Amino acid sequence: MASYTVNKAGVTFVRGLIDKKRYVLDSDWGDAQPSADEQNAYLDTHSWKEYAAWHLGLTEGANDETKARYAFVVGDFSRVHRTGLIACVYRASEWRHKEVELAAHKLLQHLDKVSG
């Protein structure tokens, strides 16, 4: 099983989006999360750094500037999705990636506080 560290730059970026009210409170994450084609299209016009910012986890041992490096996406490359954060908490918890789970949980709590 892969091991992950928290993408601190991603956490900061997502928190900033929440503070700017760039979020979706009610969505179907299965439909909203970026497909492989949408990820490729995003990378055609954005840097790897910008792509990485949408992910809360970094895969240990994976090369930088590869899709394999970045895990636990929480937005659609435009807005953070509450359901994306919930999915991240759930997946990280299920696979015992505690630090990623806690980072996602804190962001979810922040989103709930900001959104009232």
What do these predicted ranges mean?
Residues 1-116:
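A charge-rich, low-complexity, intrinsically flexible signal that marks solvent-exposed coils, linkers
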